[in-house]
Amino acid sequence: MTRFTLRLLCLSAALAAGCAEYKPFDTAAYLRQRYAQEIGAQEAARIAVPFELNAEIRGSLKTLPPLSSELRRINQVNDFIFDGLKLQYSLTPTKDAAETYRTRTGNCLSFVNLFVGVAREVGLNPSYVEVTDLQKWNHREGMVVSQGHIVAGMYLDGELHTYDFLPDRRKAYREFKPIDDVTAAAHYYNNLGAEALLGGDLARAREMITVATRIAPRFDKAINNLGVIQARGGEPQKALETYQRGLAISPGDPTLQVNMARALQQLGRSGDADQLLAKVEAENTTNPFFFIYEADVAIGRGDANKALDYMVRALRLDDELPEVHLGLVKVYLALGDLGKARHYLARSLKLDATNQDALRYAKLLGQ
């Protein structure tokens, strides 16, 4: 045997050994390292990895046949979730991958948590993707609570493909932003905090939102919600400072500005608040959610006709948003026109039969 042949055999053996020892990159462990960099190892150990799978899920995935094509594996993941688990939509609470698998229910982010975990387990490289041109506003007591809309995404042949829980719902999405796992985890905790906030549980809301702001200090949605918690807790000055911090990160963000105006009102600075709200209205002429918010505020102060003006503007911007039609339901109820209220309620439910507010109004109106 020549020296060259011997070297070639040694190289082949080394390569074979390396291939045998290959393991996929542990994204859950890496995310925990990222947590530890921000908040320390001890606290990081208590933070959930939303896409992490347990032994039961991994065992189920072992029954799937291996497939070489990425597209076929993506279809396999969707079939596993929807045909195998028969996942059903449930608005709240947001769940991690393991809990979504266990209950077979979840919302859009719950689905993405499970999709990402399962897809990575079968050798794919999906990511969380934020839909940046759909910024839904949830508001209570004149303040806006921030929640982003997240879908799963993966590049195939250089093109980003996205996967959503409700693919049959009308999609007006145009702008997508893949985000890293730290930001995705912050979205998860922000969702939990927002759900608690909208449900009136300020203690849990503060706990969840604080986690989001600590692991992702520049995550503006969680910063906004922290300000709302402070304002609700009787700390408008702290809330104002929090909104200012958020605006330093995201200048011109309308959600932060609207909430800042509310804090200014609480501090007795009505002139500054009115000036800021006028600026927001001038800059948000294409955002239907802003006009829905303004209509709700107008109803709250007893000006149903002004609320109707706002909702007409929202309807002109997007007549296929269920929230627009639900806003018209509220306006026409305030005006005492039950016929039109029922008409727009039916339209809202046709566009989104899962909308919890619409379902509550349906019960109220006997539909």
Give the predicted meaning of each segment.
Residues 37-99:
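Secondary-structure boundary elements
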Residues 90-223, 238-249:
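Long, contiguous interaction/recruitment modules in multidomain scaffold/adaptor proteins
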Residues 211-212, 245-246, 279-280, 313-314, ...:
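Canonical positions in the second alpha-helix
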Residues 215, 249-250, 282-284, 317, ...:
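Structural marker of alpha-solenoid helical repeat scaffolds
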